[in-house]
Amino acid sequence: VVRDDSIIFWKNYKEFTPDTKVYVASAGKWVAAAVIGAVVDRTDLDWNDNVKKWIPEFKNDVKGMITLRQLLSHTSGVRPYLPEPRVDNYNQLDSAVMEILPLDTVFTPGTRFEYGGLAMQIAGRMAEKAMNKEFEELFQKLIARPLGMKSSHFTPVNTDGGHAPMLGGGLCTTLHDYMRFLDMIYHNGVFEEKQILKPETIHEMQADQVGN
């Protein structure tokens, strides 16, 4: 429990400590979104950019008109998860995104909200293209190292046969590391007097994206 930037209470149970590395599932979604926000801060990538601008393979597909904003706000129409049975045998987001390309949308982009993680793979690939770096490298350079998150990374849950970074559920971190991220969010993008994310990016991350 933190109050006024000071820990006033903490307790751990059994083998779990503040330094135990765990997968935090969907609690990593906004960490991935922060990485993408940091790319928006530094490049021509914009929240309202269409997918096809950065991934030309989508130019003749309805999903090519989906915006980065829709991908990250669960309003894109991209199905929530890959259909079963399906095995992701790809090590990179570029290959993983090509698995999404032939899948039909489940609703017209921008007309509904449906929670899921698959759309974030496309968003991550847009960020990769904008900075010409792989997503894990972006995370380490733009978020993890500036925050001192030394034990955190996006990694495969199962490495058998390879696996692309899971932006919607693949963050492995510790309580200490995660608190550093939360501290930055709470202080409007600032951590230890360093501006990690622009205030307007924090605002976009927390704004109502559906309107109803």
Across the structure, where does each feature detected by a protein language model lie?
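A short, well-structured edge-of-sheet supersecondary motif
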Residues: V1-T17, W47, G148-K150
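Coil residues (strongly favoring Ser/Thr
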Residues: D5-S6, T20, S95, T105
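Short, solvent-exposed loop/turn and secondary-structure capping segments
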Residues: N12, L82-R86
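Active-site helix/loop module of the DD-peptidase/beta-lactamase fold
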Residues: P18, Y23, A27, D41-R79, ...
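Solvent-exposed loop and edge beta-strand segments that line ligand/cofactor-binding
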Residues: V24, P109-F113, A164-C172
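Catalytic nucleophile serine of serine hydrolases
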Residues: S26-A27, E114-A119
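Active/ligand-binding-proximal structured segments within catalytic/core domains
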Residues: V31-A32
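Active-site-proximal alpha-helical segments within enzyme catalytic domains
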Residues: H74, A119-M126, P165-F191, E200-Q209
